[in-house]
UniProtKB/Swiss-Prot annotation:
PROSITE patterns: BTB
Span of domain BTB: 31-98
Organism phylogeny: Eukaryota, Metazoa, Chordata, Craniata, Vertebrata
SMART domains membership: BACK (SM00875), BTB (SM00225), Kelch (SM00612)
Function (record text): Substrate-specific adapter of a BCR (BTB-CUL3-RBX1) E3 ubiquitin ligase complex that acts as a regulator of the insulin signaling pathway, modulating insulin sensitivity by limiting PIK3R1/p85alpha abundance in adipocytes. Targets PIK3R1, the regulatory subunit of phosphatidylinositol 3-kinase (PI3K), for 'Lys-48'-linked polyubiquitination and proteasome-mediated degradation.
Gene3D superfamilies recorded: 1.25.40.420, Kelch-type beta propeller, Potassium Channel Kv1.1, Chain A
Listed name of the protein: Kelch repeat and BTB domain-containing protein 2
Quaternary structure and interacting proteins, as annotated: Component of the BCR(KBTBD2) E3 ubiquitin ligase complex, at least composed of CUL3, KBTBD2 and RBX1. Interacts (via the BTB domain) with CUL3.
Kelch repeats: 317-380, 381-429, 431-469, 470-529, 535-581
Modified residues (Phosphoserine): 300
SUPFAM superfamilies: Kelch motif (SSF117281), POZ domain (SSF54695)
Keywords, alphabetical: Kelch repeat, Phosphoprotein, Repeat, Ubl conjugation pathway
Amino acid sequence: MSTQDERQINTEYAVSLLEQLKQFYEQQLFTDIVLIVEGTEFPCHKMVLATCSSYFRAMFMSGLSESKQTHVHLRNVDAATLQIIITYAYTGNLAMNDSTVEQLYETACFLQVEDVLQRCREYLIKKINAENCVRLLSFADLFSCEELKQSAKRMVEHKFTAVYHQDAFMQLSHDLLIDILSSDNLNVEKEETVREAAMLWLEYNTESRSQYLSSVLSQIRIDALSEVTQRAWFQGLPPNDKSVVAQGLYKSMPKFFKPRLGMTKEEMMIFIEASSENPCSLYSSVCYSPQAEKVYKLCSPPADLHKVGTVVTPDNDIYIAGGQVPLKNTKTNHSKTSKLQTAFRTVNCFYWFDAQQNTWFPKTPMLFVRIKPSLVCCEGHIYAIGGDSVGGELNRRTVERYDTEKDEWTMVSPLPCAWQWSAAVVVHDCIYVMTLNLMYCYFPRSDSWVEMAMRQTSRSFASAAAFGDKIFYIGGLHIATNSGIRLPSGTVDGSSVTVEIYDVNKNEWKMAANIPAKRYSDPCVRAVVISNSLCVFMRETHLNERAKYVTYQYDLELDRWSLRQHISERVLWDLGRDFRCTVGKLYPSCLEESPWKPPTYLFSTDGTEEFELDGEMVALPPV
């Protein structure tokens, strides 16, 4: 037998030993210490307690009276919580939920059970949301939990406009309030929001907080306030407070000219699962700012995740769900010519994008695995609808709903029909799901589906967008009746893209003006609402040609599409045809700007003096 074989660890023996200790505990065999909490006795083994708890290790090894006692009374400890920790000590299983985790953390902190503390920290960080972030910030500060504190603070900054009215915000300590109000990362579009939050906190308990008037108001960047707000605010103050306020505002002057992070937000087109410009990877995630005409790199979804569903909520939170990941231990080549060499596994992953950190944060997974599910946000909940899956037709009908406050998924009424592909939008708190020439409407309050008017054309893989009380169904592949043959949308030569409009008030479809496109192009149309206008992002060239992208804008009154913007090929490379496209507000300073690229062809490839560059004809200068 080799030396390596002799040193192998028998994990089965370790598990068996733990199981035997558990049986000794349950049968009260060989116990040598009794913990007493609130009149409840817990016979235990000193060795087990000392192994998991620094508190008990110090107690039993100190040589003091407690080390010789057979009964120890514990103060300020809950009996039910102690039972959870003891069970963990003997089994490694930790039972916790939203109602017990904070008490469990407090007890584990007192008993110095580091493993339990770490598990509780991870649980709480995962559960942070707009409803509890302020309270968890105070909780983390109380127990000096820096990791939890920073995560909670980032959520407070991100959701500031939603949380500063909460009672938990009114009860923040002075130091925590200053830490928040002084932050450059507050997601506010106006400094008036910060001023209002500061005044609400001060007025919550005027008598005890008047001493903090100057220090609190010094965090307000007065130069960012409108002149009307400055004048009205100062004139409305009591005479005794005016000098204090003036001193406080004077202290804030060095920060006058630095905007909050939320003031730098730009509305961007977000491309998930676009073809990568890096030949060593298949996909990339980028965003394009139409105002700045710049492309920024987003953190790609974890574990090479692709074929996901995407959604941006009204609160500007970005989520992705479902998709596929490469199987582990398979020969994987990430080059673009080796897609078929990799085996994939369908997953139920669900991620939230932390825009400050430019990273994807895992949330509770969906109940079903899904490929390219339709994701929408309706009445504060996120719905995952259909999608392709390994469960066949039955699974394609399933619909589940995510509660952002509870971080949990529940099933709702299934789709009336099963489809491999569908598009979904939300209008007037109702969800409209479309495929081929069919459309169904889901009413969340009654949890029911109703079939709506059929479209005039049968198309799949189209792009849909809601604009006001209208739904636009754009592009896609025509399905020939009874044949299943798919033809490009629009005219025979592909020189336009078909558009249909649905009026939710009249329950009727009508044809709209087609979108112009170059002959034989491959549009890859994506409908979006940007700058309060309905637009389409599309490719003007065939996939075999150099990629050239444009955006068109629709005029509802004139029923006309007009060119909004040409996008330089030096800015945006070939995105492929399977990318997801949505619109959200992001912070340029938190993103990595994509480097400038020279034109694909610096000179004409055929030697002529005139050639096309970025959509324009360019002539070589005379020699």
